[in-house]
Regions:
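Catalytic machinery of carbohydrate-active enzymes
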Residues: 1-306
Length: 306
């Protein structure tokens, strides 16, 4: 028999979904597990080894019915015995409706499905929601992400023994999710005096912030545009600390076991989606413009020793 799991995005959610896929795999030993996801996450999920096959969903506009129907026919023809909807979006509810007459057992939030988990009426962390969803079919608590499959050689970066990660970026279209670069720099300088070298992480879109931090904290090491997902996980395993905005790389770093402080504004709700673990601290202000360097430093978790 074959099992379909659906998880489209985004990076942080994909990291949080890894324990779910691991639990589904254990619950269905010997069955063929297929993941329906989007192109940016195919490589990550292949490397995880948690699924046997990956389908890419282009997520066409729902009015482009021809493309949507091709996917629906593919799902029907595969003869899945069960579908785990780990996305829980309007799109995946629509997929369920389009499968009328030939539906596999569906575990999700689509009204009328075999194992229905209602959408929460109050803020609930996605991990808890999915834990309850899987419990409907007898799957035990999936636990936390394990990124042991993400390994890389970070010796090429020439980092000192004691370093910390600064992740000042975020979605370009949501600038309110970013703590000001000058405060990242000020915090970096404070921690530099305590023996931790700041290492700057980001993409091309964050080049401006990282350049500003580097100017104000010249001893920081600039790795902008140089790190893969595997690099981030490996850097996180060896870093003493990490501090960053609510962005995908912080999910990877925190999931690697790095003591982490994640910063939130009114733009996102850490009660719904945030890294998990005893080594993770969350700090929120209505506006990150109002978060002082002193308050951020006070909120840091204990640094990893050695």
């Amino acid at each position: 028999m074959a099992i379909l799991a659906i998880k489209h995005s985004a990076l942080g959610d994909m990291i949080l979904s890894l324990p779910l896929l691991r639990a589904i795999r254990r619950h269905h030993p010997g069955e063929h597990i297929v993941l329906l996801t989007t192109a940016p996450y195919v490589d990550l999920m292949h490397r995880s080894g948690l699924v046997d096959e990956i389908w890419t969903d282009t997520r066409p506009k729902l009015w482009r019915i021809g493309e949507t129907w091709r996917l629906i026919r593919r799902i029907r023809d595969a003869g899945f015995s069960r579908v785990y909807d780990l996305q829980g979006s309007q799109r995946t509810k629509w997929y369920y409706r389009l499968l009328a007459g030939a539906r596999p057992e569906w575990v999700g939030n689509a009204p009328g499905c075999a194992y229905h988990i209602p959408d929460p009426t109050e803020p609930m962390h996605i991990t808890e929601l999915r834990r309850r969803q899987l419990a409907l079919v007898g799957i035990p608590d999936p636990g936390l992400p394990d990124l042991g499959f993400l390994q890389s050689d970070i010796a090429r970066f020439g980092l000192p023994p004691r370093y910390m990660l600064l992740v000042p970026g975020g979605a370009p279209h949501r600038p309110a999710k970013r703590w000001p670069a000058e405060r990242f720099a000020a915090l970096g300088n404070r921690l530099l005096h305590k023996g931790l070298t700041p290492v700057l992480i980001g993409r091309a879109a964050e080049r401006g912030e990282i350049g500003a931090i580097k100017s104000a904290c010249p001893e920081a090491i600039d790795l902008c545009e140089q790190t893969s997902i595997a690099d981030l996980a490996t850097l996180g395993r060896h870093a003493a600390l990490a501090i960053g905005n609510d962005t995908g790389p912080m999910h990877i770093i925190a999931a690697s076991g790095c003591p982490s402080l994640v910063l939130y504004s009114h733009e996102s709700d850490p009660r719904k989606v945030s890294p998990r673990g005893d080594w993770v601290r969350l700090l929120q202000r209505p506006s990150l413009q109002d978060l002082s360097v002193e308050d951020a430093e006070a909120a840091l978790p204990p640094a990893r020793q050695g």
